[in-house]
């Protein structure tokens, strides 16, 4: 836990994990794991540095760069780089903390970390972004490596930025190695990587539908937030599987379907083009079957929905919006974004699950539901280490297996450690938290990172 009063995002992530551990039988059966939680909540290393670069007018600009190397008990630090003006140590510690247990749920050998800078790529020229990425990597390259720390993309860091950073690393270190994931296919990247988080989210929720007896996606109405990679590819996969996508959004507002047909593949392709040009959805020329709601999130405007998938950013579903989704008939909520729901919203969903039993909403946390992205990053690392490339079908099949295992790992762990009434769906948030934590805690114990009294 933080020793500072100014890390609200990290405190929220810690409290969410600690609450589920405390309200299970884990600490009763294994009281020594309290020590593990105390140790695991402090990063192994925090790297903070200045990034000095030159804008197109020849002016000196400076930003704050970070890398939080949180836990390496299961493998090299693994987690994205975020470029956004909101980036600070609290946000990166929250993301890195979540990443530890998310990576554990994939079953792959990856530790947890996160990094980035308070640089805003919006409105910057290609040359400015290149100069920033090179300046950022001039320091970061000293602290990363294929067997040490393997960053990836995140908000503000796509294929272009990964390319600039990889080139800067290669020149500075004089090595060509799998030090970053999300690379171009011709220089070490993996097929399915851009689609992985969205596809994996849909595969995960498919197991929720099947286990609960709700059937397939056919005919289900799905509300999505966000309009980046996660939302785009989740929407395309949902449509492929027969669902109706009723919303997308960005920081400027929400795009909501007005009729029964929903958002089409053509609409999503148009959104992709807009986002590729780094523009807002306000520039989307929507037809009569869609409406634009300025400054709004979609949850209270979508009408009847069966499934809600927050895919934009943290804390994007409030208590009031959670209650609104329940009133709209929503039965499944899964986070495509990290910590997409506030603690109060999660409480609404979990209380409903306990009270309504088989008729309740079923909530899945981001560390399980959106682990597909980092899973395929891990598969990219495996391909890099073997100097080979798998086919799209091979990667997709491995992704499906990872999401299936993440679902059943959380489900079965909840059955062991969380008491449930007859007919009550298991708590996926508790089960996923416990499963990820126990795996990491045991590895830390075996390696001497913590110990119990004899």
UniProtKB/Swiss-Prot annotation:
GO terms for molecular function: glutamate dehydrogenase (NADP+) activity. Keywords: Acetylation, NADP, Oxidoreductase. SUPFAM superfamilies: Aminoacid dehydrogenase-like, N-terminal domain (SSF53223), NAD(P)-binding Rossmann-fold domains (SSF51735). The active site is at 114. Its EC number is 1.4.1.4. It catalyses: L-glutamate + NADP(+) + H2O = 2-oxoglutarate + NH4(+) + NADPH + H(+). The modification N-acetylserine is found at residue 2. The keyword Ligase does not apply. One of its GO terms (biological process) is glutamate biosynthetic process. It holds the Pfam family ELFV_dehydrog_N. One of its GO terms (cellular component) is cytosol. InterPro entries: Aminoacid_DH-like_N_sf, Glu/Leu/Phe/Val/Trp_DH, Glu/Leu/Phe/Val/Trp_DH_C, Glu/Leu/Phe/Val/Trp_DH_dimer, Glu/Leu/Phe/Val_DH_AS, Glu_DH, Glu_Leu_Phe_Val_DH, NAD(P)-bd_dom_sf. Belongs to the Glu/Leu/Phe/Val dehydrogenases family. Homohexamer. This is NADP-specific glutamate dehydrogenase. It comes from Neurospora intermedia.
